[in-house]
Regions:
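A generic secondary-structure signal marking the coil-to-beta-strand transition
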Residues: 17, 130, 136, 148, ...
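Inter-domain interface/hinge segments
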Residues: 120-122, 126, 131, 161
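A structural motif detector for beta-strand N-caps
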Residues: 132, 138-140, 144-146, 150-152, ...
């Protein structure tokens, strides 16, 4: 699907405005500018996304999140600038979304269950992609892109504007902006450095058939067929000893290896230095875990 898009849905709102939108139909738009129209009597809403500009309103923010989770667009293909300024912080409850600041006014005797205080809802409350498994639905935000065959285990987390090509095994954290190539595995507790906070400005990606060991992490991109040893965090500034041939090595910044395929990153257990060398074998997923999602 390409822009311009006309989206139809039903919104949840209070006296201050729109809280959430549940979209159900997407068509080509004939409008010339971004706009939305809401029927006050039925809460039905029509949104026109013509230009992929910075987000200015809640309905457009929700539409862009939907478009990723429905696999119409991949991470980093839409502009999400301003989304944190536009979306309110909400309590996601068994009675639907409500403003977090209003919780103190509620009757404490009410049977109210609060699942989260966040600007983004769990994806599975609004979109169920075909062919995925999510062990804990609260750990995948709306706006995540999960390719068919993806398995998210209990400790896995996927932010908005991030995701997987599928099939993939995810037991670690996929930060905003990060995209994981097919047949790659993120081990338990591993981390991918995003661009929402801190000093990292580069968008991180992981290629195909990669393995990030348990409690490892990356601040650089990986090409295809790479492995990060368990417990090793490779940031852009990490000094890496590249073993080129037997007896030949070169010390370089990890950033200069970003995107390189076929490397094994590990820490020398005798010297403590971080090393990289060409891999002798390739990694494969257990297909049985992903074919019947």
């Amino acid at each position: 699907m390409n822009l311009p898009i006309e989206a139809h849905g039903v919104c949840t709102q209070d006296e201050h405005g729109v809280l959430a939108v549940r979209y159900s139909k997407f068509l080509p738009s004939t409008e010339k500018t971004n706009s939305f129209h809401m029927d006050a009597n039925s809460n039905e809403i029509v949104v026109h996304l013509v230009e992929d500009a910075a987000i200015q309103d809640i309905p457009t923010a929700w539409l862009k999140l939907y478009l990723l989770s429905l696999r119409y667009f991949k991470p980093n293909e839409l502009n999400f600038d301003n989304i944190f300024s536009v979306l309110p912080n909400l309590a996601w409850t068994n009675n639907g979304p409500m403003r977090a600041e209003n919780l103190s006014d509620l009757n404490l005797n009410e049977d109210l269950k609060i699942f989260a205080l966040d600007k983004f809802p769990p994806m599975a409350d609004y979109v169920i992609p075909k062919g995925v498994r999510i062990a804990d639905a609260s750990r995948v935000r709306l706006g995540a892109y999960l390719g068919e065959g993806t398995t998210i285990m209990h400790e896995g987390f996927v932010n908005y504007n991030a995701g997987t090509e599928g099939p993939n095994m995810i037991e670690g954290r996929i930060s905003a902006g990060v995209f994981i190539g097919k047949d790659s595995d993120l081990g338990g507790g591993c981390s991918t450095m995003g661009t929402l906070s801190g000093g990292n400005k580069a968008v991180i990606s992981v290629g195909e058939r990669c393995l990030l060991g348990a409690n490892s992490g990356i601040g650089i991109s990986l090409g295809d067929d790479c492995t990060i040893e368990a417990g090793l965090y490779v940031t852009a500034g990490t000094k890496v000893t590249l073993l080129i041939n037997e007896g030949e090595e070169k010390i370089m910044k990890a950033l200069d290896l970003s995107g390189t395929s076929g490397l094994l990153y590990y820490r020398d257990s005798l010297t403590g230095k971080v090393c990289a060398k060409p891999k002798a074998s390739s990694f494969t997923l257990n297909k049985e875990l992903h074919e019947n999602n």
